[in-house]
Amino acid sequence: MTLWNFYFQLFDKAIAKEEVVVFLSYLLQRISSPLLIVWDRLPAHKSRLVGEFLDSLNGWVATEYLPPYAPELNPVEYLWGHWKQHELPNVCPKDLWQLSEGARRTLRRLRRRPCLISAFWKQSSLAFD
């Protein structure tokens, strides 16, 4: 999630260190400027594999961690809250494919609302110097 946009990938399993590296590679293909990634403390984010991958980028990607147990500081939590309440309320997909396609479609639609993305950052009260 940038201040005006967000990037996502859907995986058919729980996110582990390998998926984090795949997603970082995906970001690097789409964003041509250095990145600051603000992460929660998911163990995969702090794994050796992810650390080695980040080290191989020679400072192109910097990371900061949110304090433990502070979902209110994570703008992604506000994105998910909005998504569940306003984009997919009462959705009952017939199968995993239908769920995946519905998620992809609604997340892409949210990308076209930069003011809303900006509001998620403001709600989180994160300060950038």
Language model feature labels by segment:
Residues M1-D129:
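Short functional hotspots at interaction and active-site rims
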